[in-house]
Amino acid sequence: DPAYFADRQAAGDTLWCYSCCFPDDAYHLNKFIDQPARYARLIKWACYTSGITGFLHWGFNFWDIPTYGTAPDAHYKGDGFIVYPDTENSAVRMSARGMATTEGIEDYELLKIAEGIDPIASHALANTVARTFSDFSADPEAISHARQTLLALCEMGKREQ
């Protein structure tokens, strides 16, 4: 219920979210292997436009659980992990979805910086990319353009200081 969350935010509460298994379709942002990696990035843009200040990444390393794995019959492909084991080197390897998640976090922080410079422009820009978790642009060029515009806005604010 969006009104409930808006009321809580108006009362001064912070709003966090996370993705875990659902929704598992192509019309909602998530981080499944079957979705474009940019969806994982856009989650953070939708967090920004929704006033969400925290994101819990569920399942960093559940690659050994078949339900969340990469097998064709896995129900939630990739939801349980964004890294892969590198047992030979006792390390982990980042996935494309993990890198996209990192880029999304960086974008979120840049949006917050831009908000301090020009809140109207920052929110308008974010809305060109992800208005909600189910209303977003899947166009890579639009996302790239928004990122470049965001960087320019932050740079403009830096020069004015």
Features from the language model and the residues they span:
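Catalytic-core regions of glycoside hydrolase
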Residues: D1-P66
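Catalytic domains of carbohydrate-active enzymes that cleave complex glycans
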Residues: I52, T67-Q161
